[in-house]
Amino acid sequence: MNKAGQEARGFFIVLSAASGTGKTSIRRIFLERCPEVQFSVSYTTRTARPGEVDGQDYFFVTETDFRERIDQGEFAEWEENYGRYYGTSGKVMTRVLEQGRDMILDIEPRGAKTLKKNYQGGIYVFVLPPSLAELKARLRKRGESEAEIRKRLDKVREEIAEARGYDYVIFNDSLEKAVERLQVIYQAEKSRASRMSKQIQGVLDSE
């Protein structure tokens, strides 16, 4: 892609984390502060949680519907997680990026790996808990059983190991600080010289 095409096209941030790390809260506050960024609404077969809105938090669909979308090649990535399916629409993603808008995607490490193979130019950010002990306490507060917590922690260890393959790592030791760190990453990526050739030329022509 030439410089003009790279500058005109938006870029996307992939935000991943282990379960219970606070990724959703970070993403929501980030979007409030950076309204120019569009959230990629995923499809899922899980039921909506209290307060979630169809088409805003997720597109809630049946497993039959989801499988039909897989067969039609609609997803840029999809995965099964705890018996439920999640997927990102490739068509929507391509359209938004070609319009020059930036996006943020909230997906798990396995889905991020698939996306990385299929789409270039993404910025991959992994959110870490301060410690596994802190994460265990958060899961207990959510009312999960000890057996479920042990099961989740086994998977969490596998997910956290994937952080080494990401571009950036954010510790969620404080929600406010975590959001600020994500904002800094976004602004730094926006300021890359490869995305600023129009502004550079504007200064050169400003005499």
Swiss-Prot record:
SUPFAM superfamilies, A to Z: P-loop containing nucleoside triphosphate hydrolases (SSF52540)
Binding site for ATP: 17-24
Gene Ontology CC terms: cytosol
SMART domains (UniProt xref): GuKc
A GO MF label: guanylate kinase activity
One family name in Pfam for this protein: Guanylate_kin
Keyword hit for Phosphoprotein: no
EC numbers: 2.7.4.8
Main location: cytoplasm
Location of the Guanylate kinase-like domain: 10-187
Class of enzymatic activity (EC top level): transferase
Compartment annotation: Cytoplasm
Reactions mediated catalytically: GMP + ATP = GDP + ADP
UniProt KW keywords: ATP-binding, Cytoplasm, Kinase, Nucleotide-binding, Transferase
Gene3D superfamilies attached to this UniProt entry: Guanylate Kinase phosphate binding domain (3.30.63.10), P-loop containing nucleotide triphosphate hydrolases (3.40.50.300)
Physiological role: Essential for recycling GMP and indirectly, cGMP.
Stated family: Belongs to the guanylate kinase family.
Name by which UniProt lists this protein: Guanylate kinase
